């Protein structure tokens, strides 16, 4: 099925037209010294700029909607998009208005006062409980109010651009329902993300290596099941590797283990023994703390008193050897607690192996989420990878073969 693109909309002409853009601006935000907002990783804001800039530059009246965190359907000053709006304005090189509400009197007044090329950012869409409601009627009611901001009282004069790939797996008012009311288009970011994932699923060059990390097997069971049948190698690290080690009957000490998933991991190991690669050694510590004393131990000899917080150097070498031969690589999830410098070497080592493979011609995709955060936290070059996704959960669900509501609704 065809999806209309941002270029299609620009070709139709947007000068003087209201355009609602659903962006993904969910960035890590903390307040320093009480009131000074600090965005530690502006990657998603940066990725949102090209679509917004193209529309504003073509004379559209651009209204951006996005979420930040999980405010549980009510206003939370610490989750206001005001600091994000300031950062967006700096990147765009123009003033970005920030409404004091989602679809209330301030948003409506500001929308009515927009001139060609202006940009307005609505307040955190999740301040309105209807955004994430399971009730179709409630979501549709909010979607109508959003549509009216760009299309007037009838909501028919504007357009909708979906450019928040990180939320396209959610059936939410600003992602799905509003697209049923307005002419809809995929923004440049969403179109690029979908194209990359189609390469991973439809035209993968082999050998195909998948690297999965993170803490819980249950979070990635479906994608493990799916990719184990498609990949030539499935490298598993992070906290979830300990459930696999436990499934082999090995001692894991105080490491994170999902006991209810042990039998499932055993089945996976039996079925895909030639595909799955587990760590050979572990960086173990006394407790989950940045300054906890650590030692490198064999993966089959983790002491009862210790917990694994990273993969060891021999594991990095083994995984790097697998990756060095790959032509296609998908990575989702860190190999250890990269936020603690003492336990970041595994993630860094595997990431550098992916970069080296990319330099040799491999097509590499970082699957968003914590993996993308690790790339930036460890000061690794974004351009060392073929593509860094802005949507961890959306990427995984696409690779599982699930229908993504925010993509499905765009298809004509």
UniProtKB/Swiss-Prot annotation:
BP GO annotations: gluconeogenesis; glycolytic process
Enzyme Commission no: 2.7.2.3
GO cellular component entries: cytosol
UniProt keyword terms in alphabetical order: ATP-binding, Cytoplasm, Glycolysis, Kinase, Nucleotide-binding, Transferase
Residues where substrate binds: 24-26, 44, 67-70, 126, 170
SUPFAM superfamilies: Phosphoglycerate kinase
Protein name, UniProt field: Phosphoglycerate kinase
């Amino acid at each position: 099925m065809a999806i209309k693109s941002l270029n299609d909309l620009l070709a139709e002409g947007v000068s003087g037209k209201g355009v609602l853009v659903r962006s993904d601006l969910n960035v890590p935000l903390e307040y320093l010294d009480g009131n000074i907002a600090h965005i530690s990783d502006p990657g998603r804001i940066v990725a949102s700029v090209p679509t917004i800039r193209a529309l504003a530059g073509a004379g559209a009246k651009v209204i951006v909607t996005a979420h930040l965190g999980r405010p549980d359907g009510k206003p939370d000053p610490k989750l206001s998009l005001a600091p994000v709006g300031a950062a967006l304005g700096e990147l765009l090189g123009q003033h970005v208005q920030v409404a004091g509400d989602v679809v209330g009197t301030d948003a409506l007044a500001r929308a009515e006062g927009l001139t060609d090329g202006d940009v307005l950012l609505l307040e955190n869409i999740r301040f309105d409980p209807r955004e994430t409601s399971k009730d179709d009627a409630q979501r549709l009611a909010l979607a109508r109010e959003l549509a009216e901001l760009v299309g007037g009282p009838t909501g028919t004069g504007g357009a909708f651009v979906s450019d928040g790939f990180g939320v396209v797996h959610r059936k939410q008012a600003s992602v799905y329902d509003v697209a049923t009311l307005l002419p809809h288009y995929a923004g440049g970011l969403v179109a690029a993300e979908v194209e990359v994932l189609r390469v991973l699923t439809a035209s993968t060059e082999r050998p195909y290596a998948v690297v999965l990390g993170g803490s819980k097997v249950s979070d990635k069971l479906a994608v493990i099941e799916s990719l184990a049948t498609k990949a030539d190698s499935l490298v598993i690290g992070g906290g979830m590797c300990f459930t696999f080690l436990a499934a082999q009957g090995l001692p894991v000490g105080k490491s994170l283990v999902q006991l209810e998933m042990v039998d499932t991991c055993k089945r996976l190991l039996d079925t895909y023994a030639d595909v799955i690669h587990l760590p050979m050694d572990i960086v173990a510590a006394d407790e989950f703390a940045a300054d906890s004393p650590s030692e490198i131990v064999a993966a089959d000899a983790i002491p009862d008193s210790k917990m694994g917080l990273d993969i060891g150097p021999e594991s990095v070498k083994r995984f790097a050897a697998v990756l060095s031969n790959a032509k296609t690589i998908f990575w989702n999830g860190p190999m250890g607690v990269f936020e603690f410098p003492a336990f970041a070497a595994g993630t860094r080592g595997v990431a550098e192996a992916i970069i080296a493979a990319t330099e040799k011609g491999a097509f590499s995709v970082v699957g968003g989420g914590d993996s993308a955060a690790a790339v930036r936290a460890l000061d690794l070059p974004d351009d060392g990878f073929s593509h860094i996704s802005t949507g961890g959960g959306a990427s995984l669900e696409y690779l599982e073969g699930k229908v993504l509501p925010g993509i499905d609704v765009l298809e004509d």
